[in-house]
Amino acid sequence: MEHITSRQNALMTHIRKLNASRAYRRASGEYLCDGVKLLEEALRWNAPLKTVVLSEGVDAPALPSGVRAVQVPADVMRSISPMETPQGALFTVRLPDTALPEMLTGAHYLVLDGVQDPGNVGTILRTADAFDCDGVFLVNACADPYSPKTARATMGAVFRRDVYQCTADELCALLQKSNLPLYGAALRNDTVSLRDAELSRAAVAIGSEGRGLSAEILSKCEKTIKIPMSPRCESLNAAVAASVVLWEMYR
């Protein structure tokens, strides 16, 4: 295993940039994850690892050939970790091909419209994985699904679930071509209860907590749906609302 003791080493600088910049992640074609448990998930699901950095004293797992393995002292790990308290392991993963498919052949898709909190996006991806959602689309400046915070919140779902980033027009053209209706979680004259919606084959859009669905996405929804809840409550957290919708599509 390679040993690095300098914070100014080129790899350490590269890792800090992966942590800080979405544009840098895209340009370099890889993203950063942290934690021993997440590394175990990445190995379990054959994620395309590029580099693994471990703190001194952390046992190295069996790594695929071609993966660069590095050990660093505690002070260097603190300088590159996205966590205030480092978890002992950092690793980089090759970004997946996120080009839109020619056709959607699945039955259930989720659309996130302007959901900007990384923790919410990560939790939603984790829930989408649990309920066998066929794909998640991110439109209108959602949080980066490949930031360290988002990836951590997915608990490994980022390694095995399709996530597409596209414009609203690209999304709607693909849904139309695939003969998939788009429903929006919002109130409108045509709003129906989630329990009564026909979700056997559909895409459902969830908006941000502060603004809800954008006018752009709302105008493209064939119908809108609402989650039945106590009149005392006005709305749900975006991740909670997505979880309820995903469960309803799954069951």
Task: Place the predicted regions along the sequence by residue.
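Boundary-proximal intrinsically disordered activation/regulatory segments immediately upstream
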Residues: 1-57, 142-143
